[in-house]
Amino acid sequence: MESTFSSPAEAALQREAGSAGLRTSLGDLDRVYELERVVGFVRDLGCQRVALQFPDQLLGDAGAVAALLEEATGSKMFILGDTAYGSCCVDVLGAEQAGAQALVHFGPACLSPPARPLPVAFVLGQRSVALELCAKAFEAQNPDPTAPVVLLSEPSCAHALEALATLLRPRYLDLLVSSPALPLPAGSFNPNPEPLERFGRRFPLAPGRCLEEYGAFYVGGSEAISDPDLDPDLSRLLLGWAPGRPFSSCCPDTGRTQDEGVRAGRLRARRRYLIERARDARVVGLLAGTLGVARHREALAHLRNLTQAAGKRSYVLALGRPTPAKLANFPEVDVFVLLACPLGTLAPQPSGSFFRPVLAPCELEAACNPAWPPPGLAPHLTHYTDLLPGSPFHVPLPPPDSELWDAPDVSLITGDLRPPPVWKPSDDPGCSALTPKPQLELAESSPAASFLSSRSWKGLQPSLGQTPVTGAVSGRRGIAIAYEDEGNS
């Protein structure tokens, strides 16, 4: 009977876990994974135990890479995979459990600083780039040789940007090359002036110049991807780039270009809709999407204070990687806010999979902080550290007696007038939400209780005295997929 709706119960016990196999030939492992640089990193530190972190798509090469590194360094290598959160973040907790003295991160990385001090080396990969095709595509997209343009790329193509700029500089006068914001070695020389760090990249701007003056040419992506909105790195750039500047992308294999202006407008419209949903929300779920990135506890406290100031109830949920099945267990929550790294916040979310919107911390800030600039003037910040005190983008909450809290606000989704929030500090004895009524009754104002009262099913009821007393009988045996009394039909 169970085969009609699902696979037999024995299939889970007989299933064999497949292996991804060796994806890269042995002759190319040294070049693709920069083994010579990794060996120098391990020898300079004198580490005896090193953790090697691989994403799922590169686990097929993990065994061969670890064997080559052990042979070259004499150190013990530990392979880390299946991270609790995003694979782009450094798995500091996994490295500590293995007793590793250093960590080497392979594959795409958000380059967020870890929460605990640990020597880390990043190997972003070296994807082949058709320089001649990309140069022709750049010339077709940028006919004006005097227009300022910055070269961007996905992390695995960053090694080819300087060579591409060499082909273009004889004609283009104002060309800027970005580079990944890798951590600088201890004791290294800091250039003066220091380059601007944004979007996980460094921009060597000349004195008096700003990044908002430049257009962008992005090298990365693949034509095999049917939905380009699933690239979190490119989405981060499109959301944070100046709206009035041109932005185009180029496939490194074929040189095919695409104007990203329409896609950028669609992403911004989606984010503005999420901000409106957050303003209408009464209950906010704060998802702990990382435990290994620096200042995540401070950011969590900041978001809780933000929701309290806006008159909303917040709950902190630690669920690992968020999935629709996990979040469906909390129907009382109106919106969720994912506190994660920039790439984790913009991770692929198939349309319609989550029954409640999942927001970024920046969108909750725009919804709850009345001092935040209006849309079009405020930058879209993809890293939660940009919202904290000490950042140039930090906007403090206005005082409780500020007129900004009493400004009329109308929902663009429902058309209703939103009431101003009731600000009460956490140490106020009158913040227990118990309000005396003229009829000498007490009413408790709770969004969760209001939601429970509106539900048709409120859980199992004891029904004391309403059912006859009977003896205990034997219940059904088996599992839900196949009980013993259902037979084999």
From Swiss-Prot:
Pathway in which the depicted protein is active: Protein modification; peptidyl-diphthamide biosynthesis
Name of a matching Pfam family: Diphthamide_syn
GO molecular function: 2-(3-amino-3-carboxypropyl)histidine synthase activity; 4 iron, 4 sulfur cluster binding; metal ion binding
Gene3D superfamilies associated with the record: Diphthamide synthesis DPH1/DPH2 domain 1, Diphthamide synthesis DPH1/DPH2 domain 3
Cofactor note: Binds 1 [4Fe-4S] cluster per subunit. The cluster facilitates the reduction of the catalytic iron-sulfur cluster in the DPH1 subunit.
GO cellular component: 2-(3-amino-3-carboxypropyl)histidine synthase complex
UniProtKB keywords: Acetylation, Iron, Iron-sulfur, Metal-binding, Phosphoprotein
Cofactor: [4Fe-4S] cluster
Binding positions for [4Fe-4S] cluster per the UniProt entry: C89, C110, C341
Residues carrying N-acetylmethionine: M1
Modified residues (Phosphothreonine): T435, T467
Sequence positions bearing Phosphoserine: S7, S446, S456
Recorded superkingdom: Eukaryota
Example GO biological process: protein histidyl modification to diphthamide
Functional summary from the UniProt entry: Required for the first step of diphthamide biosynthesis, a post-translational modification of histidine which occurs in elongation factor 2. DPH1 and DPH2 transfer a 3-amino-3-carboxypropyl (ACP) group from S-adenosyl-L-methionine (SAM) to a histidine residue, the reaction is assisted by a reduction system comprising DPH3 and a NADH-dependent reductase. Facilitates the reduction of the catalytic iron-sulfur cluster found in the DPH1 subunit.
Entry similarity comment: Belongs to the DPH1/DPH2 family. DPH2 subfamily.
Designated name of the protein: 2-(3-amino-3-carboxypropyl)histidine synthase subunit 2
Species of origin: Bos taurus (Bovine)
